[in-house]
A protein has these predicted regions:
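Phosphate-coordination loops involved in phosphoryl transfer and adenosine-cofactor binding
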Residues: 4, 188-189
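Active-site and donor-binding regions of nucleotide-sugar-utilizing enzymes
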Residues: 5-180, 195-203, 219-220, 225, ...
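Conserved hydrophobic residues forming the short capping helix/wall of the S-adenosyl-L-methionine
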Residues: 27, 214-218, 242-247
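Long, contiguous binding/interaction regions
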Residues: 192
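Short acidic-capped amphipathic helix/loop micro-motif used as an active-site/signal-coupling element
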Residues: 207-212
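Loop-centered beta-sheet repeat module
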Residues: 231-241
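Nucleotide-activated donor-binding/catalytic signature segment of Leloir-type glycosyltransferases, i.e.
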Residues: 239-257
């Protein structure tokens, strides 16, 4: 009887959740019995990943937010690390979020667990010294951009170019009429997209400013149509509350995902 491959995953935000779900689907096509577990978002969970902790628990941004949440994050990462060490997956894949995942990968790698970083940190642009520490943390880097592989080859780190998922998701030629029909927007409307981000803390900090700006624009141009893609139910709730407080009565169409449209 073949023992199924066991893959540990950590995705720290909405974009990582999308990448993780695509990875799960791709691996399942090759090895249908593969088991997935770790820190995941709703898309990864729907794809079949056992969720130890939700991705949003790691999604913090900004110095104040990090300092405020530091004790909680340290405890959380300690629990995740210890659980991976106890379960010992066949491979650990950290998806984006390099500050979190490379630190975790170093501990797991030292314990003999193969480690992969999916999405290269921008070591080719700044803090190039991180490449040395990556040699001690990861066995493989999966790169979204073709030139990144060459950089890692030069630094003695195994890497593979796997392509950027948006290359498949976004057409080369945008069909604006179809996109507007899908969103229920008149073909001649002047549309303003409100994009407050995907992280809970990010949306919390920016939602009031977005709402106030939309209210001001609507006062100047009553014909404008506002559309706001929401990365998660939590982001939708936060943004809707900000609109109620700071732009009451303003018609803003909150849509789930579909930022590419």
């Amino acid at each position: 009887m073949t023992v199924p491959l066991r893959v540990g995953l950590v995705a720290g935000e909405a974009s990582g959740d999308t990448l993780g779900a695509d990875l799960i689907h791709a691996l399942r096509r090759l090895a249908p019995q593969t088991e997935f577990f770790g820190v995941a978002g709703p898309k990864m969970q729907a794809a079949g990943c056992e969720v130890w902790e939700p991705s949003e628990s790691l999604a913090v941004m900004g110095l104040f937010e990090v300092l405020r949440d530091l004790p909680r994050l340290v405890r959380l990462l300690g629990r995740i690390r210890d659980r991976f060490l106890a379960v010992r997956p066949d491979v650990f894949v950290g998806i984006d979020a390099p500050d979190t995942n490379l630190r975790l990968a170093r501990r797991l790698h030292a314990a003999g667990i193969p480690t992969v970083q999916y999405v290269s940190p921008q070591v080719w642009a700044w803090r190039r010294g991180r490449a040395r520490s990556m040699r001690e943390s990861v066995d493989l880097v999966l790169c979204l951009l073709p030139f990144e592989k060459s950089f890692y080859d030069e630094h003695g780190i195994r890497a593979e170019f796997v392509g950027h998922p948006l290359a498949d998701a976004i057409p080369l030629e945008v069909d604006r009429p179809s996109a507007r029909r899908a969103l229920g927007i008149d073909s001649n409307a002047q549309v303003v997209a409100l994009l407050p981000g995907s992280r809970r803390g990010e949306v919390s900090r920016l939602a009031q400013d977005f709402a106030a700006t939309a209210r001001w624009l609507a006062a100047q141009r009553p014909d404008l149509v506002f559309v706001a893609p929401m990365a998660s139910p939590a982001a939708r709730e936060i943004f809707a509350h900000a609109l109620e407080l700071h732009a009451p009565g303003l018609d803003v169409r909150l849509i789930d995902g579909q930022a590419q449209a």
